[in-house]
Amino acid sequence: AKGGPTPSIAVLQDLDAEDTGFGCFWGEVQSNIHKGLGGVGVITDGGIRDIPDWADGFNALAGSIVPSHAHVHLAGFGQTVRIAGMVVKSGDIIHADQHGAVVVPEEAIAKIPAACDLLQRKEAVILDLAKAPGFTFEKLKEAIAKQDEIH
């Protein structure tokens, strides 16, 4: 958000225990407020609503989509939260996309490009064969063995 690290992602834990996602904090209003403050998205185990009316380009990963906001209130800010098993502290670096989210340890950031390159090269061995005519289980076993030679 403006005045803080950017881009920023709001991370909101729903504290309603067995009723998580019954109502929601996030909809048209919150998406516009947070985008206006420099935010790029929200991650919550709670519900979201009003999706067609959200701020353009504002992203969300949520536990559910619901029709109403119900009774919501903020219980704290800048605290450690737990979202679907992921523990997030204020200031953590998060990678998120349509598949989910993960906290990235600061010491791992510099290693990410090399790890992605290695993974891509290893997967290419199998993908190229799997997409080619005549792919068999035997060819898959050969590809897996070739993967082990890539470093």
Identify the role of each PLM range.
Residues 1-90, 104-151:
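Feature captures the catalytic cores and cofactor-binding loops of soluble hydro-lyases/lyases
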Residues 100-102:
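Channel- or pocket-lining gating/hinge segments that regulate access to a cavity or pore
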